[in-house]
Amino acid sequence: MWLAALALSAAGLVGIAVDEGYTQRAVPDPVKGTAVPTLGFGTTKGVRMGDTTTPPQALARALADVQQFEGALKRCVKVPLHQYEYDAYVNLAYNIGPGKSGVVDGFCESKRGGPSTLVQRLNGGDYAGACDAILMWKKAGNVDCSEPGNTSCSGLWTRRLRLQAQCLGGAQP
């Protein structure tokens, strides 16, 4: 289906909320610490340490964040997607951000400039390769979350494996 007709499904939004978890009070980001506090269901924009929220407010903010990431995804992806692929990619973009040339790697753009590996593969018609590229996002800071026995960020790796399977048409959010 063409991207213009797609929106994150209800199941996709629930998947993001479950993956991110809920925090009533702003907490340090697991990787960036207090420099990027997170609140509610993973919201970082405009959040300061000490901020608080309620579940309905957090869900509204998460939905606003989702819409921002959907916009970025729709600008960089040029091929049609199935709903399950779209939901997986929005979830990933929500977690890693869109990226910015010269600043940070992300879903759409690489730090080195140009599209991310995932987007290059996807726009080139390599749908399976794009799904596999989800697994490239396996680090939290300098920690490889895919390493067996890892206890500090194994949840991130589990999330990536689930998103890859979902993207390939397997597990649902």
What are the functions of these language-model segments?
Residues 25-29, 73-87, 133:
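Surface-exposed patches in mature extracellular/periplasmic domains of secreted proteins
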Residues 71-74, 94, 135, 139:
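A broad detector of the eukaryotic-type serine/threonine protein kinase catalytic domain
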Residues 85-100:
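Short N-proximal segments of mature Sec-exported proteins
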Residues 1-36, 47, 53-63, 99-173:
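Long, amphipathic alpha-helical surface segments
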Residues 39, 90-94, 119-120:
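Amphipathic alpha-helical segments that form the core helices of the histone-fold
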Residues 68-72, 88, 114-117:
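A general alpha-helix detector
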Residues 54-67, 71-79:
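Helix-adjacent hinge/juxtasegments
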Residues 42-44:
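Solvent-exposed coil/turn segments that connect beta secondary-structure elements
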